[in-house]
């Protein structure tokens, strides 16, 4: 079975398939893939230049970006946040809770998330999950792709109407063969 979908939807699909006793994996073609991230933004000068609305928007972004609220949002929507937590380890601990191996798990492998949670070399080994070997190509790889996957991926761009038509035709051909 082949399906193209957002990584969060892929995780949801894998979770639902498990309920039926099926094990699906997540893969990114060697040729590359789209990179995407979800985050909040606001207009530089607020809404219609209104200082109070700008302050309200900033307060909302600050609130939703707090690590405790990031975790609530990730839990609810099933997607990884653009927020890594700053000085807080809460989001990494949540990733460990979601994907880390149980203490009695025998076949585990390290899954390095340092690129996401830290830029400092001195914390290189601090952000490594021990995951069940089966998880390395499943949910954790969909939520936190390895750096090798990120290097062969590109941020999506807006396409013209003609480019959208060509891309839609391409996907129809993929589905038909």
Question: Which residue ranges define each predicted feature?
Answer:
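Sec-exported extracytoplasmic/periplasmic mature domains
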Residues: 1, 8, 15, 62-70, ...
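Mature extracytoplasmic/periplasmic domains
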Residues: 43-140
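Conserved C-terminal helix/tail region of periplasmic/extracytoplasmic solute-binding proteins
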Residues: 111-177
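Solvent-exposed, acidic/flexible segments
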Residues: 3, 31-33, 49-57, 160, ...
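Extracytoplasmic/secreted envelope proteins and their assembly/folding machinery
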Residues: 7, 57-61, 168
């Amino acid at each position: 079975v082949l399906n193209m979908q957002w990584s969060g939807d892929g995780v949801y699909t894998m979770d639902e398939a498990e309920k039926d006793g099926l094990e699906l994996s997540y893969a990114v073609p060697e040729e590359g893939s789209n990179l995407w991230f979800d985050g909040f933004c606001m207009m530089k000068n607020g809404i219609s230049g209104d200082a109070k609305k700008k302050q309200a928007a900033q307060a909302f972004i600050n609130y939703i970006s707090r690590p405790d609220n990031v975790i609530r949002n990730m839990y609810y929507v099933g997607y990884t946040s653009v927020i890594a937590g700053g000085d807080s380890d809460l989001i990494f601990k949540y990733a460990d809770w979601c994907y880390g191996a149980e203490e009695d798990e025998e076949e585990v492998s390290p899954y390095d998330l340092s690129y996401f949670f830290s830029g400092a070399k001195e914390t290189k080994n601090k952000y490594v999950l021990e995951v069940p070997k089966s998880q390395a190509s499943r949910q954790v790889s969909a939520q936190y792709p390895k750096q090798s996957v990120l290097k062969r991926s590109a941020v999506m761009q807006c396409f013209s109407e003609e480019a959208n038509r060509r891309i839609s035709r391409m996907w129809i051909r993929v589905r038909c063969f």
